[in-house]
């Protein structure tokens, strides 16, 4: 199985696109089987079926509501692997250990 990440920002065009690339690079280097997509906060509900983990800035993460086996990771610096990396890896290792190579 592949863990599916959704990067969310206010408009879905700027920071979520960059965060998508940063998360992809980080997870590839961490040997995590994954896919990453991005969208605006107003679109996340329509994208939930294709995501296991939603990653967003802390203020946007507070607006995101999920149920079931879906998880929200709020980060202060969306572009810094030093900030989002440990939080994201913790969720993946706890809930999606089969995706860690």
UniProtKB/Swiss-Prot annotation:
Induction: Induced by L-ascorbate. Repressed by UlaR. It is found in: Cytoplasm. Keywords: Cytoplasm, Kinase, Phosphoprotein, Phosphotransferase system, Transferase, Transport. CDD domains: PTS_IIB_ascorbate. InterPro entries: PTS_EIIB-like_sf, PTS_EIIB_2, PTS_EIIB_2/3. One of its GO terms (biological process) is phosphoenolpyruvate-dependent sugar phosphotransferase system. One of its GO terms (cellular component) is cytoplasm. Its EC number is 2.7.1.194. Residues 3-96 form the PTS EIIB type-2 domain. The modification Phosphocysteine is found at residue 9. It is an enzyme of class 2 (transferase). The phosphoenolpyruvate-dependent sugar phosphotransferase system (sugar PTS), a major carbohydrate active transport system, catalyzes the phosphorylation of incoming sugar substrates concomitantly with their translocation across the cell membrane. The enzyme II UlaABC PTS system is involved in ascorbate transport. The PTS EIIB type-2 domain is phosphorylated by phospho-EIIA on a cysteinyl residue. Then, it transfers the phosphoryl group to the sugar substrate concomitantly with the sugar uptake processed by the PTS EIIC type-2 domain. This is Ascorbate-specific PTS system EIIB component. It comes from Salmonella typhimurium (strain LT2 / SGSC1412 / ATCC 700720).
